[in-house]
Amino acid sequence: MKKAPAGSFPAKPTIAPERPILVFDSGIGGLTVLREARVVMPDRRFVYIADDAGFPYGNWEEEALKRRIIELFGEFIANYDPEIAVIACNTASTLVLEDLRRAYPSVPFVGTVPAIKPAAERTSSGLVSVLATPGTVKRAYTRDLIQSFASRCHVRLVGADGLAAIAEAHIRGESFDEALVMAQIAPCFIEKDGKRTDIVVLACTHYPFLVNVLRRLAPWPVDWLDPAEAIARRMKSLLPARSDDDEFHSQDDLAFFTSRKPDYAIRRLMQGFGLRF
């Protein structure tokens, strides 16, 4: 497996900046969470970290991936001293969130888990599908959420192999085969006893980048449930309120890629999000 080169993280500034909010994902999907977080907290500073050297996480053996993420966060925390860390990746959250909290108890961690509870509260038909990576689908954590919050619903788990990579291609402006997307989402749509699936939970932060494509390809309209706004509100709730007297050293929001080799399209995308390398 590819690993980030040793000593690849920028040195911590000598003048302490405002402690940032760290947003972490395996790729660019976490930008959907960053976008909502900025709406909720426009006065905060962010550092976006993509573990593109390890992407896609679905190809990893679980224990090896756990070790990788825990080790990476040791570097991130030492270099950026985050006020809070957000795991903007369902696969990583369902696998390693509790391990991170134990390893770094001084840092509050917010995870991204499938929005099964709000889906169960909103559905009219009782037919809900969860569109996720195969790793998220197979985790006991996901099934525990269904048992706890959606036991009265019919919940179908749909493991989409490769859809996150298609989303990355789409956001880069690259072409892709829509038939492949249709094949991935088709199992989400169920008709039973005169009722139809009315909510599809987007249980991967990459998928909202495809939502317009998903709406167009869907056999009937559904609510594509994106948890990013709820995650942003949770982040804000864990941070101390600011007063007008608070003063901070003004610094840009940053982006860091573990490969240290983001291509031109990704650099342009990050700049479009106001992130500096």
Curated annotation (Swiss-Prot):
Pathway: Cell wall biogenesis; peptidoglycan biosynthesis
Source species, domain of life: Bacteria
Enzyme class: isomerase
Reactions the enzyme catalyzes: L-glutamate = D-glutamate
Matching InterPro entries: Asp/Glu/hydantoin_racemase (IPR015942), Asp/Glu_race (IPR001920), Asp/Glu_racemase_AS_1 (IPR018187), Asp/Glu_racemase_AS_2 (IPR033134), Glu_race (IPR004391)
Pfam families membership: Asp_Glu_race
Keyword Zinc-finger: no
Catalytic-site annotation from UniProt: 89 (proton donor/acceptor), 204 (proton donor/acceptor)
Positions of substrate binding: 25-26, 57-58, 90-91, 205-206
A biological process term (GO) from this entry: peptidoglycan biosynthetic process
Gene3D superfamilies linked: 3.40.50.1860
E.C. no: 5.1.1.3
An MF annotation (GO) of this entry: glutamate racemase activity
Keyword vocabulary terms for this entry: Cell shape, Cell wall biogenesis/degradation, Isomerase, Peptidoglycan synthesis
Family from the record: Belongs to the aspartate/glutamate racemases family.
Function: Provides the (R)-glutamate required for cell wall biosynthesis.
UniProt protein name: Glutamate racemase
Organism classification: Bacteria, Pseudomonadati, Pseudomonadota, Alphaproteobacteria, Hyphomicrobiales
